[in-house]
Amino acid sequence: MNIIAQLEAEQCAKIEAKRQLPKFQAGDTVRVMVRVTEGTRTRVQAYEGVCIARSGGGLNETFTVRKISYGEGVERVFPVYSPLIEGVELVRRGKVRRAKLYYLRGLRGKAARIAEKRVYRKKDEKVAERVQATAVTVDVAEQAAE
């Protein structure tokens, strides 16, 4: 590993220690908390929209968020490791088959909607959750008996 890549990895780790971002990709609706300075006041502003692209790598990684504001499409590019980003909330996952959703720029209204991705559980997971829930109930019952 060369020196520059090593320094970038250290900086990424340092920033990730302060705040954790959820794993999201193109098609997901996200709410980005951005620190905005107006004169002497500083406040946190939420910017909610569809992530249409992720690009770059390391410290230079960015993601583009598109939202419709007063009937106009507005896109904003955020660096992942920017100190101005307080956090990112994942609002919903989208079902798309592309990594870059630039085609949404030409669509309006219902045509620009993205279907929500459904997460299906396997039978084993439900059984494991039930077993864990019963174990907790039994523990509580034992503590109450004592």
Curated annotation (Swiss-Prot):
The gene is rplS. The keyword Ribonucleoprotein applies. This is Large ribosomal subunit protein bL19. InterPro entries: Ribosomal_bL19, Ribosomal_bL19_CS, Ribosomal_bL19_sf, Translation_prot_SH3-like_sf. GO terms for biological process: translation. Keywords: Ribonucleoprotein, Ribosomal protein. This protein is located at the 30S-50S ribosomal subunit interface and may play a role in the structure and function of the aminoacyl-tRNA binding site. NCBIfam families: rplS_bact. GO terms for molecular function: structural constituent of ribosome. Gene3D superfamilies: 2.30.30.790. The keyword Ribosomal protein applies. GO terms for cellular component: cytosolic large ribosomal subunit.
